[in-house]
Amino acid sequence: MLKDFPGIKIVEQQSAEWQRNKGMDLTSNWLLAGTQFDAIVANNDEMAIGAAMALQQAGKAKGEIAIVGIDGLPDGLAAIKRGLLAASVFQDPKAQATQAVQAAIKMIKGEPIEAQVWVPFELIKPEQVAVFEQRYK
């Protein structure tokens, strides 16, 4: 997929083990090492929020380095509203479960199933936060 975006270069790829404090530690370490980066993409909102906290602690202005998380959970939505995260990606757990159950039923019946089942993701930008907040009420 990156071949479609030749201007993007991955300079670090590490796991913060889905934890906010470890996301903060990793980002702090990159900053202390002098690693230059323009964006952080974290595989969940917790790690993204930790990265944002590290940048804030280092004196970086909100939005100076774009941070995107995944999940669109309430803490992630709040971080987007506060300008700490540029966006989050909502993974629809209900649609994922529905597709999984449908595939299981087909397997039980001996019917063929697709090798991959695509459940669309939704990008949550600041202007869409209110819509996603309603889903949690």
Residue ranges, per PLM feature:
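A residue-level marker of the well-folded mature domains of exported/periplasmic proteins
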Residues: 1-137
